[in-house]
């Protein structure tokens, strides 16, 4: 079989050329990173869980008319996606104060915000993904005013969808981040949700206990990350609650 051409390798995923023009194969790694990759570990099974969860969320968004880059899951670790022109921004939607917002504004973690607050960060690991305003985005040409209007609309629709989905299984959606890319159909351009949606990119707290079920488990050494992600997948019905562990094949005499 011909060796696939690697396009890009990031902290959590590898992108390969897809089988058809305009497609990409997105491979989910087991690598976990925090604090802009200052803290690293390999968490067995994390890539499989994130692949399945991102498929679940992207498919659900498609069903309610939110465009995404997702085409189909190929196997346990890979999915086929549309090639997009990524806008170099992380779009963060916050429903409750946590993380950098708590530190920046002196808000107690878990404080409910008056309404969902949308923030933008410029994607640059060397700079620590700095917070930017719409003025920066327009001035540096990262996105047009129409793009910004569309990004805001997409982000809030994703928030409505994810918040309701999580609330239904006893999980609070504290905040999340998405990336958005441009796709072109002839002369027509539209924006789609790209990258991934998983516990790597969301803050998820158990409503009753406040227990964290996201990457903060790794950031703050709060327990087993794979167990937390598995619980999210099981609550959402993405994985069966009594899944049989995968074992090595045994020989039958």
Swiss-Prot record:
Q: Please give the NCBIfam families that the UniProt record associates with this protein.
A: purC
**HAMAP family, per the entry:** SAICAR_synth (MF_00137)
Name the species this protein comes from. Roseobacter denitrificans (strain ATCC 33942 / OCh 114) (Erythrobacter sp. (strain OCh 114))
Q: In which pathway does it act?
A: Purine metabolism; IMP biosynthesis via de novo pathway; 5-amino-1-(5-phospho-D-ribosyl)imidazole-4-carboxamide from 5-amino-1-(5-phospho-D-ribosyl)imidazole-4-carboxylate: step 1/2
Instruction: Report the catalytic activity.
Output: 5-amino-1-(5-phospho-D-ribosyl)imidazole-4-carboxylate + L-aspartate + ATP = (2S)-2-[5-amino-1-(5-phospho-beta-D-ribosyl)imidazole-4-carboxamido]succinate + ADP + phosphate + 2 H(+)
Q: What is its EC number?
A: 6.3.2.6
Mind telling me what this protein is named?
Answer: Phosphoribosylaminoimidazole-succinocarboxamide synthase
- Pfam family, any one: SAICAR_synt
Q: What's an example Gene Ontology biological process for this entry?
A: 'de novo' IMP biosynthetic process
Question: Which protein family is named in the record?
Answer: Belongs to the SAICAR synthetase family.
The record's section on InterPro entries has: SAICAR_synt/ADE2_N, SAICAR_synt_PurC, SAICAR_synth, SAICAR_synthetase, SAICAR_synthetase_CS
A cellular component term (GO) from this record?
A: cytosol
Q: What EC class does the entry list? A: ligase
Q: Which GO terms describe its molecular function?
A: ATP binding; phosphoribosylaminoimidazolesuccinocarboxamide synthase activity
Keyword annotations = ATP-binding, Ligase, Nucleotide-binding, Purine biosynthesis
Query: Where does the chain cross the membrane?
Result: none
PROSITE patterns xrefs:
SAICAR_SYNTHETASE_1
Q: Which residues form a coiled coil?
A: none
